[in-house]
Amino acid sequence: MIIRPAQLLDIEKLSPLYAELGYPVKEAELVRRLKTVLSHPDYHLLVAVDDNEIIGMIGYAKMLFFENEGAYYRILILAVLQNYRRKGVATALLDAVKNCALSENIHALALNSGDTLERQIAHRFYENYGFKQASRGYSLYLK
């Protein structure tokens, strides 16, 4: 397995990962969306590839702190195909982001995760990785 930056040709292969997260999306819409997101220099997407198949992805953005100096990486999406879970793929993706952060002198990672029964396994994974529950998230959709 290798972890590498996503390429434009990869985008159309990511829809199964979105579907497994509960966000089914048409390939054309996903291509359009990710081209926009990834055109921003602070947004990044890494993919895990095994035997020429994309089996996982992690998307993150460099954010600036308001409350103190410096920056952090906010993980915006992390997904692994069902057949590859519990095989170290998500850990490898997080390790890659952590290494990128440390190379840029960034010393914090943050993420939000849905408060649903389906996400309980992910929450345990994050805690086992070293994340601490630090806040509560809220959403207000305006459309």
List the model feature ranges, each with a label.
Residues M1-L9, K143:
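Conserved N-terminal entry element of GNAT/NAT acetyltransferase domains
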Residues L8-G70, L76:
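Acetyl-CoA-dependent GNAT
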Residues Y43, Q133-Y138:
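Short hydrophobic/aromatic beta-strand or adjacent loop that forms the aromatic wall/cage
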Residues M63-F65, V80-N83, G114-E118, K143:
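Short coil/turn motifs at secondary-structure junctions
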Residues I75, L109-S113:
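Conserved hydrophobic beta-strand within the GNAT/NAT acetyltransferase core sheet
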Residues V80, R86-N99, R124, N128:
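Conserved acetyl-CoA-binding loop-helix of GNAT-fold acetyltransferases
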Residues K87, E104-H107:
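Short coil/turn segments at alpha/beta junctions that flank glycine-rich nucleotide-binding fingerprints
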Residues T91, H107, D115-S135:
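Conserved active-site alpha-helix within GNAT-family acetyltransferase domains
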